[in-house]
Amino acid sequence: LNGIVYASEKPENLQILSAKPLDDMMMILTFSTGEQRLFDATVLTGSAFAPLADEKIFKDCKVVDGIVTWMDEDIDCAPEYMYEHSYAYLA
């Protein structure tokens, strides 16, 4: 509404511009909205995400076409999901 995104609303055409992996499966994400948000990747469960438990694999992420990917794009996570499950980060 009037260029303001409220907490209950997801921005349209959301993309991730950068991802900075931290310890303990946390990462700082920069979204196309300009927001930086803290994402706890332990919410990524199931066999598809099991390799991310290896810290070396988790920290070797790349952003491809606005999506965070791992293992040469074999694993990815939708920007909308990461936005909904992250918290505002104030550096």
Model-inferred region functions:
Residues 1-91:
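Motif-centric detector for short Cys/His coordination patterns
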